[in-house]
C-alpha cells in the first residue's frame, strides 16, 4: 500500500500480527447519513423516498375539512440556502438553518352536484419555518453554540414476552406477560395473575379479562375455545359413554378405570399409571374408542353450545362444566355426541376457559362498552363513540403506528418470517397469535425475550428524532388547518392563510435547543468531539430514567460484542446508560446496530464482509479475529475458539460460519487509542478512555511514541485537520491559508483549477480551549486527494496527539508522589511542554433602559486615566492589550434614577432628549483570577443605530481582508487558467490575431509573452476545436470575475446591515482573551491507562533523579500505583516508549556520521526496525531523499503502533530494546541486562539509588481540571436574598460554607467567640457585618454580633403557621 504524503514523513511501526481486511469506516457516518436522509435536500422531488421530512408531510397531508368539502394536499418541499454560513452564525449567536418551503394545494369541492366534483384548485408555496442544518462534522450551530444530537437507544417497537421472575407472588410462581409496543399509540399488555386468569390492559390502565378483548374483535365463546384448545369427543350412552381414544393424551395419566382391549383383556388396571408400553399394546389391539364410566365425564368442560335438536333450545353453554344435572338434561334432549376441552395439569392449562368464566360481558357490543368505560371512566357510552374509540385504539393509522421495525419484529416473533410486510396497525391475527404464544409460554413451551438483547433495542438517530419533532409540530398545524378549512371557501382563503409555521418552528427549536438529547458539544479535543457524536444514550424522552434503570440494563450484554463498547461509559449515576458505538459498528435500515464479519466459504476465510445485526448473529458460529490461519486462509488448529448465541465454546473448523474482522472491533474509538489495553484492568481502562477526552490541547502537540495505529483515523475523521479535496501542487502557504493548484486530470473542464483552504486561527472551542490550524506542507509539495495539509488542535502530522511523551521513572521520591501525586521536573514547565492556551469570551450588552439608553464610552467618571489607557476612543479595549483581573475592557455607563423627577422636569427631559445626569459605571471588567491578552473584539450594532468608529473599522478590516482573499484567488485562478491556455496555444496555426498576426503563422512563447494576456483571446485559431476551448476559457474567466464581484457585494451587504440582537439590546460587544496556562501544582494529569494524579511539586531539574549520562527524569511516579490497580499496560508502554526513543537516538547517531553512506546505513537500520517483527513497512518504496527526511523526523523517537488485543509481545519489546540499546550504549547508560531498568542517581546528593529503577517514555496528558479554574477566594461579595447568607460556588463569587460538622468541631474545642463570629458577622448578621467592616477600616478590631437574618426567617416561618413567637431580653 503506497504511503500518503504525510504518512511518508513519519511511518508508524506496527506490531500487528494480521493485515487489515477492512479499514475503520468513517467515524461520523451515522450522524451525517441519518440527517442527510432526513433532509433529502439534494434529491429530486420525484426521487425522494418516504423518509424524514417527506414521511412527516405525507403522513399528515392531505388534511380534510370536517364537512369533507375542502382539502389541503401536500405537493413537495424545498430547502433554501442558509443566510449566514457556520462561522458567521457562531459569531453572531444565530442558528445555522435553512428556510423550509412546502408547495401545497388547496382543493375545494362543489357540494351542489350529486357526487362532489372539484370546483377550484389553488397551489402555493408556504413557508414552514427554519430547519437547522448539520455542519460537515456532524454538529449543529444553535444560537451560536455548537451542539450535538446524541443517538438514543430505546426499546424497539414489537411484541415482547417476559415473566416477573417470581417476584410478584409470595409463592415464587412465574407470572408470564406480553406487551405490544407500537412506535406511537397505545401499549397493549397481556398478563397472567396468580390464579392463572389471563388479563389485558391498555396504556397501563386497570386490567380486564382478555376474553373481553377477544369478544370485542368479534369472537364468540365457542370460537375462542376452538382457537385455544384441542377437543375430546364423547358419545353418550345411557350409562357412561364412549370416548375417542387419542394415545398421546393418555401417556403418564392415572387410569381411573380398567382399560381393556376388544377381547376384554385388561391392559391397564385401575389406579395404575399409563406408560409407553401400555400405549403400544393398546395401539396393537387396534382400539379406537374406550368405554368410560359416568364419573369420568363429571368436571369436564363443554367446548360448544349443546342444542336440543327438536326444539332448538340451548341445553348447555360452551365452557359449562359437566355435572349430573347437565348430563341428564343432555340425555333428555337426545344429544348423542359432545365435545369437551382437552386440558391437563402439565402442558395444557385451562387458562382461557377460566378467563371466560371471569368475564361477565355477553356479546361484542358489551365488550366494547366495557373497554370504553375503562378508557373513559364517567362518560356515557354512546354507540358511535364506543365504536370510534375502539377503532382508534389499535386499528387507525392516524393514532397507531407499529412502524416498519415494529411490523418486522411482530412478524418474526410470531413466526411469520423476518420481512416487514403487513399493515402498520395491529390486526386481529396479531392479537390472537400473541395471546396464543403467551399461553404456550405458560404451558412451558417457548422462550421469553431478553429485553437487554440488542435485537430488542434499537437506535434512534438525529434524523429520526428530528422527524418525530417535526411531525409533532405538523400535527398542531393540522388541528388549526382543519378548523379554518371550513371557512376557506366562504372567505376566499389561500393556502398561506391556512398554515401558520409557528408551531413547527417552536417544536424544532425546542428539540434542538433544550431537548435532553441535544447537548452542548464536548469540544475539549478532537477525540472528545468524535466520541460525543458516536454516543448512544438510553436516557431522554421515551427512554429510561436514571432512577428507574436497574442493574441489568446497565450491564454488558453478549450482543454488545462489536456493536457497543464494553469499556467506555461514564462513571457515576449514568454508568451503563450512556454507551459508545464500537469502532466498526453501523446501523442497519431498521436502526439495529450491526458489526462486520468475514464470511467463511468452504472452510476458507474469505475477504467477503457481511454486516450482521444481533438477531442475525445468533444463528451463526463466529471465530475470533486472532484465530491462527494458514496461507490459504484455513484454520490451523483442530479446535477453534468461537461464539454461538452469546456463549463461548471450542468447535471444529468445519462448523464455523464467520470470523471477526479485527481484534479491535469490540471497543470504541477512545478505548482503541489505549496501547496494551489487553493488559489493563477494565475499571482502569474505563477511566483511561474517559480521561483522554478531557486532555487539553498543548501548545506544541507531540505524537505519542507508543500508539495503536488509530490515531490518524481519529484526527482525520474528526475534521480538525484540513484535508485536500483534490490532488495537486501546493502553490502558496502562509499561516492563514494553503493554496493548491489542482492536477489537470482531477480538474473538471470549465471549473476553477485552484483550491483555497482558509485555516482556523486561535478560535475558542465550547470548552474554552484553543482551536488553531497550522500548515504542514511547503510550497511545491505534491499532494494527493485526502492528504493532510494542516494540523489542528491536538494533532501532529495528521495524527492525534493529546499529550506529551515524558521520561518517566517509577520510584518514590520523598513523599511527593504519595497517593498518586505526581512529581514533575521544572524543565517540563520551562520548555512549555504542557502549556496550553485557553480563550475566554467576555460579553457586554448596552440596553435601552426606562431611564434612557446605556452607553459604550471612554468617558467614565471616577476612573483614573491609568485604568482607561487600554481603551480606544470608542471605549473598547485594543487588540493585543495585556489585561489582568479588574481591568476595564469595555467602558459602559447606565443611567440611574434615584432622584424622583417632577412632572415638569420629566417633560423638559422628554422635549430636549437630555439623558439622566446620574450615571453609574457598569463597564465590562476582567473577572477575578484571570490574566490574558486581547486577541479579538467583535462589535454588533442594532439596525438603525449609528456605528461607532471601532465597529466601522472592524467592518472595513474584514472587507479588506475578504477583498484581498478574493483578489488572490482570482490571481491564482487566472494564472492557472492562462498557463493552461499558453500550453494549448504554443505551436498552433492561426487564421489571424493582434499585432498583424499573419494567417497560417504558428504561435510562439515569445509572441504570447509580448501580448497582454487578455489579448490572447483575440487570436483566431485555425483549428475549430481549439478555438471553442479558447472561447470557453474566456467565458469561464469572465464568469469567475463576475462571481467574485457578486460574492464581495454579498459579504458587504451582510457586514453593513444591522445585526439581529435580542429585544432591548442596542449594542453587543464580545472581547476574546487568550489566557496562557502553564503547568502548576494542583493541575490534574493522567496517562492513558487510568493512572491519574495531581501535580504535587515542580522540582528544579538539578534535584530530579538522573541517569548515568546525566539525563534527568521528567516525571517521577509512585510504583505503588501499579500493582493494586492492575493497569500493567502503563509499564509495557514505558518499556516500548524507551525502545522507541532509543531507536531514535541510534538514527540520530547515524545521521551525524558522514553524508555519503547515510542513506544506505539508515535504510539498513530502518529495515531492521520496521521489518523484524509485526506487520512489515515498505521502506524500499521510498527514495533516498524520502528516507533521509523520514530519518530526520524519527530522530526524536520512532513512533510505534501496538493495536488493541493484537499488540507487541514481551519478546518483541525485548528485541526492540536490544536494537535501541546495543551493549556498548547500555553499559554507558548503566542499563540492566533487560534494558528496561537503569541505575539512577539522586540529583541532590549525587549518590546512586540502592536498586535499579524502571524508566522509559509514556504519553502523559494534562486534563481539563486546572487549578486556576478551581482556585477561588472571597472577602465580601453577593448574599442570598432571603437568608442573607453568602452565596456558594466560584461562579457566584461565593463563600466557603461553614457547615454543621464544622460547627461541631468548634463546639468541641469550646471556641465560643470564633463560633459566634462564624454564625453572625461572617455570615448573615447584616448590621453586624457592616459594623465590622467599618471597624476594620478604622483599625479597631471589635466584633459587635447581633441577630442572624436566617433566625428571623425561621421566626417568620413559625408565624406563618399561626404561632406567634417573641424574643424577650432577660
Swiss-Prot record:
The keyword Membrane does not apply. This is DNA-directed RNA polymerase subunit beta. It comes from the Bacteria. It catalyses: RNA(n) + a ribonucleoside 5'-triphosphate = RNA(n+1) + diphosphate. GO terms for molecular function: DNA binding; DNA-directed RNA polymerase activity; ribonucleoside binding. One of its GO terms (cellular component) is DNA-directed RNA polymerase complex. Its EC number is 2.7.7.6. DNA-dependent RNA polymerase catalyzes the transcription of DNA into RNA using the four ribonucleoside triphosphates as substrates. It holds the Pfam family RNA_pol_Rpb2_3. The RNAP catalytic core consists of 2 alpha, 1 beta, 1 beta' and 1 omega subunit. When a sigma factor is associated with the core the holoenzyme is formed, which can initiate transcription. Belongs to the RNA polymerase beta chain family. NCBIfam families: PRK00405.1, rpoB. Signal peptide: none annotated. Keywords: DNA-directed RNA polymerase, Nucleotidyltransferase, Transcription, Transferase. It comes from Bordetella parapertussis (strain 12822 / ATCC BAA-587 / NCTC 13253). GO terms for biological process: DNA-templated transcription. The lineage of its organism: Bacteria, Pseudomonadati, Pseudomonadota, Betaproteobacteria, Burkholderiales.
Amino acid at each position: 500500500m503506497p504511503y500518503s504524503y504525510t504518512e511518508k514523513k513519519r511511518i508508524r511501526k506496527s506490531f500487528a500480527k494480521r493485515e487489515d481486511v477492512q479499514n475503520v469506516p468513517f467515524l461520523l457516518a451515522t450522524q451525517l447519513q441519518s440527517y442527510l436522509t432526513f433532509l433529502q435536500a439534494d434529491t429530486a422531488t420525484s426521487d425522494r423516498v418516504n423518509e424524514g421530512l417527506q414521511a412527516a408531510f405525507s403522513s399528515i397531508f392531505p388534511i380534510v375539512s370536517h364537512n369533507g368539502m375542502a382539502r389541503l394536499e401536500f405537493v413537495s418541499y424545498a430547502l433554501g440556502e442558509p443566510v449566514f454560513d457556520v462561522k458567521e452564525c457562531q459569531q453572531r449567536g444565530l442558528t445555522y438553518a435553512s428556510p423550509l418551503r412546502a408547495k401545497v394545494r388547496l382543493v375545494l369541492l362543489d357540494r351542489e352536484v350529486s357526487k362532489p366534483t372539484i370546483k377550484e384548485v389553488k397551489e402555493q408555496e408556504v413557508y414552514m419555518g427554519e430547519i437547522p442544518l448539520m455542519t460537515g462534522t456532524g454538529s449543529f450551530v444553535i444560537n451560536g453554540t455548537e451542539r450535538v444530537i446524541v443517538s438514543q437507544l430505546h426499546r424497539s417497537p414489537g411484541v415482547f414476552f417476559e415473566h416477573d421472575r417470581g417476584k410478584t407472588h409470595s409463592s415464587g410462581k412465574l407470572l408470564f406477560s406480553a406487551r405490544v409496543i407500537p412506535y406511537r399509540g397505545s401499549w397493549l399488555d397481556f398478563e397472567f395473575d396468580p390464579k392463572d386468569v389471563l388479563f389485558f390492559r391498555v396504556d397501563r390502565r386497570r386490567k380486564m379479562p382478555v376474553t373481553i378483548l377477544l369478544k370485542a374483535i368479534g369472537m364468540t365463546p365457542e370460537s375462542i375455545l376452538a382457537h385455544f384448545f384441542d377437543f375430546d369427543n364423547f358419545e353418550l350412552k345411557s350409562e357412561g359413554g364412549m370416548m375417542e381414544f387419542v394415545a398421546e393424551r393418555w401417556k403418564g395419566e392415572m387410569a381411573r378405570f380398567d382399560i381393556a382391549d376388544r377381547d376384554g383383556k385388561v391392559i391397564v388396571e385401575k389406579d395404575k399409571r399409563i406408560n409407553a408400553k401400555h400405549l403400544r399394546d393398546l395401539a396393537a389391539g387396534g382400539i379406537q374408542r374406550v368405554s368410560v364410566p359416568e364419573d369420568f365425564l363429571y368436571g369436564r368442560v363443554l367446548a360448544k353450545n349443546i342444542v336440543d335438536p327438536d326444539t332448538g333450545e340451548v341445553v348447555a353453554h360452551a365452557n359449562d362444566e359437566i355435572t349430573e344435572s347437565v348430563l341428564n338434561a343432555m340425555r333428555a334432549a337426545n344429544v348423542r355426541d359432545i365435545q369437551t376441552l382437552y386440558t391437563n395439569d402439565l402442558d395444557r392449562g385451562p387458562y382461557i376457559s377460566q378467563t371466560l368464566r371471569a368475564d361477565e360481558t355477553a356479546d361484542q357490543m358489551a365488550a366494547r362498552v366495557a373497554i370504553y368505560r375503562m378508557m373513559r371512566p364517567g362518560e356515557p357510552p354512546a354507540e358511535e363513540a364506543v365504536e370510534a374509540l375502539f377503532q382508534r385504539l389499535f386499528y387507525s393509522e392516524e393514532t397507531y403506528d407499529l412502524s416498519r421495525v415494529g411490523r418486522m419484529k411482530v412478524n418474526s416473533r410470531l413466526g411469520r418470517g423476518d420481512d416487514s410486510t403487513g399493515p402498520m396497525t395491529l390486526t386481529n391475527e396479531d392479537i390472537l397469535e400473541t395471546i396464543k404464544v403467551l399461553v404456550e409460554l405458560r404451558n412451558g413451551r417457548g422462550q421469553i425475550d431478553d429485553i437487554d438483547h440488542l435485537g430488542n433495542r434499537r437506535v434512534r438517530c438525529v434524523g429520526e428524532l428530528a422527524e418525530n419533532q417535526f411531525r409533532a409540530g405538523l400535527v398542531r398545524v393540522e388541528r388549526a388547518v382543519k378548523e379554518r378549512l371550513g371557512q376557506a371557501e366562504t372567505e376566499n382563503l389561500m393556502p398561506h392563510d391556512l398554515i401558520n409555521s409557528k408551531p413547527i418552528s417552536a417544536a424544532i427549536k425546542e428539540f434542538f435547543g433544550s431537548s435532553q438529547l441535544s447537548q452542548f458539544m464536548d469540544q475539549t479535543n478532537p477525540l472528545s468531539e468524535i466520541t460525543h457524536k458516536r454516543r448512544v444514550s438510553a436516557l431522554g424522552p421515551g427512554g429510561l430514567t436514571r432512577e428507574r434503570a436497574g442493574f441489568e440494563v446497565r450491564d454488558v450484554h453478549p450482543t454488545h460484542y462489536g456493536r457497543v463498547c464494553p469499556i467506555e461509559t461514564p462513571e457515576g449515576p449514568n454508568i451503563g446508560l450512556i454507551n459508545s458505538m464500537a469502532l466498526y459498528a453501523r446501523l442497519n435500515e431498521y436502526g439495529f446496530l450491526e458489526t462486520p464479519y468475514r464470511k467463511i466459504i468452504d472452510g476458507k476465510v474469505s475477504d467477503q464482509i457481511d454486516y450482521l445485526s444481533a438477531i442475525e448473529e445468533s444463528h451463526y458460529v463466529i471465530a475470533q479475529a486472532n484465530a491462527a490461519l494458514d496461507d490459504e486462509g484455513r484454520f490451523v488448529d483442530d479446535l477453534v475458539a468461537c461464539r454461538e448465541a452469546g456463549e463461548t465454546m471450542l468447535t471444529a473448523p468445519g462448523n464455523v460460519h464467520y470470523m471477526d474482522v479485527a481484534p479491535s472491533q469490540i471497543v470504541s474509538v477512545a478505548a482503541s487509542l489505549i496501547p496494551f489495553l489487553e493488559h489493563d484492568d477494565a475499571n482502569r481502562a474505563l477511566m483511561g478512555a474517559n480521561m483522554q477526552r478531557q486532555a487539553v490541547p498543548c501548545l506544541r502537540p507531540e505524537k505519542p511514541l507508543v500508539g495503536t495505529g488509530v490515531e490518524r483515523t481519529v484526527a482525520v475523521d474528526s475534521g480538525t485537520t484540513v484535508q485536500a479535496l483534490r490532488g495537486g501542487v501546493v502553490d502558496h502557504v502562509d499561516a492563514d491559508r494553503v493554496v493548491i493548484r489542482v492536477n489537470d486530470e482531477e480538474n473538471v473542464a470549465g471549473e476553477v483549477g485552484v483550491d483555497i483552504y482558509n485555516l482556523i486561527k486561535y478560535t475558542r472551542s465550547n470548552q474554552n480551549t484553543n482551536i488553531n490550524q497550522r500548515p504542514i506542507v511547503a510550497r511545491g509539495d505534491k499532494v494527493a486527494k485526502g492528504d493532510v495539509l494542516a494540523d489542528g488542535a491536538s494533532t501532529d502530522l495528521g495524527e492525534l496527539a493529546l499529550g506529551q511523551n515524558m521520561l518517566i521513572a517509577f520510584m518514590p521520591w520523598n513523599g511527593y508522589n504519595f497517593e498518586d501525586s505526581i512529581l514533575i521536573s521544572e524543565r517540563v514547565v520551562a520548555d512549555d511542554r504542557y502549556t496550553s492556551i485557553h480563550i475566554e469570551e467576555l460579553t457586554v450588552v448596552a440596553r435601552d433602559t426606562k431611564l434612557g439608553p446605556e452607553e459604550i464610552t471612554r468617558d467614565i467618571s471616577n476612573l483614573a486615566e491609568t485604568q482607561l489607557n487600554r481603551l480606544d476612543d470608542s471605549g473598547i479595549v485594543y487588540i493585543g492589550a495585556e489585561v489582568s483581573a479588574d481591568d476595564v475592557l469595555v467602558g459602559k455607563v447606565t443611567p440611574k434614577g434615584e432622584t424622583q423627577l417632577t412632572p415638569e422636569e420629566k417633560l423638559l427631559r422628554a422635549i430636549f432628549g437630555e439623558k439622566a445626569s446620574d450615571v453609574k459605571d457598569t463597564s465590562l471588567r476582567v473577572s477575578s483570577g484571570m490574566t490574558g491578552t486581547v486577541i479579538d473584539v467583535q462589535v454588533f450594532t442594532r439596525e438603525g443605530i449609528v456605528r461607532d468608529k471601532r465597529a466601522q473599522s472592524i467592518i472595513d478590516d474584514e472587507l479588506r481582508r475578504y477583498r484581498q482573499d478574493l483578489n488572490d484567488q482570482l490571481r491564482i485562478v487566472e494564472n492557472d487558467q492562462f498557463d493552461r491556455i499558453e500550453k494549448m496555444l504554443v505551436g498552433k496555426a492561426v487564421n489571424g490575431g493582434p499585432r498583424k498576426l499573419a494567417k497560417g503563422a504558428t504561435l510562439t512563447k515569445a509572441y504570447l509573452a509580448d501580448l497582454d494576456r487578455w489579448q490572447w483571446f483575440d487570436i483566431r485559431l485555425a483549428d475549430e476545436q481549439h478555438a471553442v476551448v479558447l472561447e470557453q476559457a474566456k467565458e469561464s474567466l469572465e464568469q469567475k470575475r463576475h462571481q467574485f464581484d457578486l460574492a464581495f457585494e454579498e459579504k458587504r451587504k451582510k457586514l453593513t446591515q444591522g445585526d439581529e440582537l435580542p429585544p432591548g439590546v442596542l449594542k453587543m460587544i464580545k472581547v476574546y482573551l487568550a489566557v496562557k496556562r502553564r503547568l502548576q501544582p494542583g493541575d490534574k494529569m493522567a496517562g492513558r491507562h487510568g493512572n491519574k494524579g495531581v501535580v504535587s511539586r515542580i522540582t528544579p531539574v538539578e534535584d530530579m533523579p538522573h541517569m548515568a549520562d546525566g539525563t534527568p527524569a521528567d516525571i517521577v511516579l509512585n510504583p505503588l500505583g501499579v500493582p493494586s490497580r492492575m493497569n500493567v499496560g502503563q509499564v509495557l508502554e514505558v518499556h516500548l516508549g524507551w525502545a522507541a526513543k532509543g531507536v531514535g537516538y541510534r538514527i540520530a547517531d547515524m545521521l551525524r556520521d558522514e553524508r555519503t553512506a547515510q542513506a544506505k546505513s539508515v535504510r539498513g537500520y530502518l529495515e531492521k526496525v520496521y521489518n523484524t517483527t509485526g506487520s512489515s513497512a515498505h521502506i524500499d518504496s521510498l527514495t533516498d531523499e524520502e528516507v533521509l527526511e523520514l530519518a530526520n523526523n524519527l530522530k526524536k523517537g520512532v513512533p510505534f503502533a501496538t493495536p488493541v488485543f493484537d499488540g507487541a509481545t514481551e519478546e518483541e519489546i525485548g528485541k526492540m530494546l536490544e536494537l535501541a540499546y546495543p551493549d556498548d550504549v547500555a553499559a554507558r547508560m548503566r542499563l540492566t541486562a533487560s534494558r528496561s531498568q537503569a541505575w539512577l542517581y539522586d540529583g541532590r546528593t549525587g549518590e546512586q539509588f540502592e536498586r535499579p529503577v524502571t524508566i522509559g517514555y509514556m504519553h502523559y496528558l494534562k486534563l481539563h481540571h486546572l487549578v486556576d479554574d478551581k482556585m477561588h477566594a472571597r472577602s465580601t461579595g453577593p448574599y442570598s436574598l432571603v437568608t442573607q447568607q453568602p452565596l456558594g460556588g466560584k461562579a457566584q463569587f461565593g463563600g466557603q460554607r461553614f457547615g454543621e460538622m464544622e460547627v461541631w468541631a468548634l463546639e468541641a474545642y469550646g471556641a465560643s467567640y470564633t463560633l459566634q463570629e462564624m454564625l453572625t458577622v461572617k455570615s448573615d448578621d447584616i448590621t453586624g457585618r457592616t459594623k465590622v467592616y467599618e471597624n476594620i477600616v478604622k483599625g479597631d478590631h471589635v466584633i459587635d454580633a447581633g441577630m442572624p437574618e436566617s433566625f428571623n426567617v425561621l421566626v417568620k416561618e413559625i408565624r406563618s403557621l399561626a404561632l406567634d413567637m417573641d424574643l424577650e431580653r432577660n
